Amino acid sequence: MKHLQVSTDPRRMTTQVEEVAAALACAAGRTAQLLRSGLDPTAQVPGLTWTAAETAAHLVADLSEHTAILTRTYHAPGTAGGPADQRNAAERGAAANRAQLGAFPERDLVVLAGLIEEAAAAFNTALAAQPGRGPVVTANGVRMDPATLVSVLLGEQLIHGLDLARSAGRSWSIARADALRVIPGMMAIAGDYLDRDAAQDLHVSYELRFGPGDRYRFVVDGPTATATRAEGTHGRPDCVITADPVAFLLVGYGRAGQWSQILRGKLRAGGRRPWLAPRFSTLIARP
């Protein structure tokens, strides 16, 4: 699929990446503060198979892994597969996550809090040292440019921070501005996570609208999908989804049901075939 970029101006691109990196550091600090607040490390995270400690360990391992990928010191565990690997990115990602946790045994939440802050700082240092870096290939075989990678890692931090808070019945907020920083990364790799079974024989174009200047076209053509910025896109889409950015993030990561967000007016459908809107969330596989 075509990988999105936020801007074609290198100076603007650098500024945007720095902005997302700063948001990542802030989110990591919030996560660390939560981990130091007396959470039960053995508490089950709602909706996941992980405990709070395992979720925190995943955040550390994931940041460290992507730092190693950026600095070319990463040694793949063999989960990405080769050309004959028919698994989608979500299935390969689940295998990579299992390998991560198996190789990283730390489960003390206070220790993990410090490690999350250190890992986020190390990632941002590696990111800043390579402003012109081209795409890298992650453990699940997905190609990402640095802007996409830092955006995706911010999403991981925000969503798993929510998971940790929910394990203890705590509150956790996600700002609209942060959701808008994550969405470009989500859209850039959405085609890699296409559920081929769900998309079989489907030919549809979606336009996703999050506000002025934040519109994307997602075109599904059977077993493949392409995401592009909607600005300058020719032709009318089949279905238009106007979404609150935070609601889209929560539904996209499987942390909220789409119907609850629809009833709250956070997701609205339009276009020539609006009945296709509820199907959109079923097209993206999750690890």
Residue locations for each model-derived region?
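An N-terminal domain-cap segment
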Residues: D9-A57, H66
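Amphipathic, well-ordered alpha-helical segments in soluble domains
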Residues: A27-T31, D62, A119-A122, A126-A129, ...
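Short, contiguous alpha-helical
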Residues: L39-N88, V137-D195
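A glycine-rich beta-turn/hairpin centered on an aromatic-Pro dipeptide
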Residues: V182-G222
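Acidic/His-leaning functional-site neighborhoods
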Residues: D214-V240
